[in-house]
Amino acid sequence: MTMNNFTTTMQDISTAFTIGSLEIKWYGIFITVGFVLAIILACVKLEKWYKISCNPFYWFVFIGIPVSLLGARIWSFIIGDASKSLATQNFFAAFFNFREGGLAIEGGVLLTVIAALIYFPLVLKKPQYNVKTKIGNEYYVKQVSMWVYADAIVPCILVGQIIGRWGNFFNQEVYGPIATEAELAWLKTLMPGVYNNMFITTTGNLHHPFFLYESFINFWFFLAIYIGGEFIKKRKAGDLAIAYFICYGLLRSCMEPFRYSDYQFATSIVMSVLFALFGIILLVCNHLVFSKHRDFKFWEFIIYKTKKFFKQDIKEFLDSKRNADNLKVQKQINKNITKEPNFYRKPSEIFYYNGY
């Protein structure tokens, strides 16, 4: 097919259908479908795999979706090209015109993570979300860690990104560098519909399907984290959530320079590198520090470290505080109170990963 053939067969594919004068864009449809599937898969992991309540996450959805859209839009105005629409529209009209694209994933993730760090520690303190675990012949009531929810929810963000990238295709945006027909012969054979629409009229050239490459790689990242990660024996609570930041940061760091020049933003590349570095540092800390101290309450830690000055007072104090919520904690402290080894509580999150 020659370039002239491309020109004569090209058509606007951004609109899925119309309701009266309202055009429903494919971009919005793919973003919505991505959100819905991500929510479903997160709930499946929580309810069926970890055996814990999905309700805290369910209610967070009503906070997380608008927050993520807001963060993605703000970030697109800061580091992307969404601000160009201000030349023809007022700020509010341009900012809330999601149908035309302009959502930067990093901004959505960052703002949603901040919201989650505030929301989940508060909500999970409610007794109705505690989990009863049987160890031997005894039952213990445990407060579910925020990290358990993070492991179930965060990797599912990749699902939204896998599907959402197809919105870029229908909008004919965020494409790769100029390509020859020979380079995309495989695409013409396997996905002729995509191939025929990779001739971008604004540049007058055939381009690599950047959206397809990133979507495909994210798909395998998702399978590796969501399913494969559950079979890693020595992992800690939080590792799967952290793996998302590492994988996505590395992918974007490698893929960003591959974008067509009009869609390359230096700030986006820097943020992608920071995402990956943040994930790597967090993973190291999670294994060396967080997993060992995560379950300590501050006062328990201080009391244990000063036990040699008033052992009996500590024992009486801990006995008086024993209840269903911290029974295992007290037994561990009482067991170790006359010993001097480094006293670390076994992370309670392991119960949920073992199917209790």
Curated annotation (Swiss-Prot):
Task: Please give the biological process terms from Gene Ontology that the record holds.
Answer: lipoprotein biosynthetic process
- Where does it reside? Cell membrane
Q: Which residues bind a 1,2-diacyl-sn-glycero-3-phospho-(1'-sn-glycerol)?
A: 165
Bilayer-crossing residues are: 24-44, 59-79, 103-123, 144-164, 209-229, 265-285
Q: What class of enzyme is it?
A: transferase
Query: Which pathway is recorded for this entry?
Result: Protein modification; lipoprotein biosynthesis (diacylglyceryl transfer)
Report the PROSITE patterns cross-referenced here: LGT (PS01311)
GO molecular function per UniProt: phosphatidylglycerol-prolipoprotein diacylglyceryl transferase activity
**Which keywords describe this protein according to UniProt?**
Cell membrane, Membrane, Transferase, Transmembrane, Transmembrane helix
Q: What is its EC number?
A: 2.5.1.145
* Keyword field contains Cell membrane: yes
Kindly give the membrane topology term recorded for this protein.
Multi-pass membrane protein
Keyword Cell membrane assigned = yes
Listed under GO cellular component are:
plasma membrane
| Pfam families named among the record's database cross-references | LGT
Q: Record's superkingdom?
A: Bacteria
Biological role:
Catalyzes the transfer of the diacylglyceryl group from phosphatidylglycerol to the sulfhydryl group of the N-terminal cysteine of a prolipoprotein, the first step in the formation of mature lipoproteins.
What protein family does this chain belong to? Belongs to the Lgt family.
Q: Entry's HAMAP family?
A: Lgt
The protein, known as: Phosphatidylglycerol--prolipoprotein diacylglyceryl transferase
Q: Which organism is it from?
A: Malacoplasma penetrans (strain HF-2) (Mycoplasma penetrans)
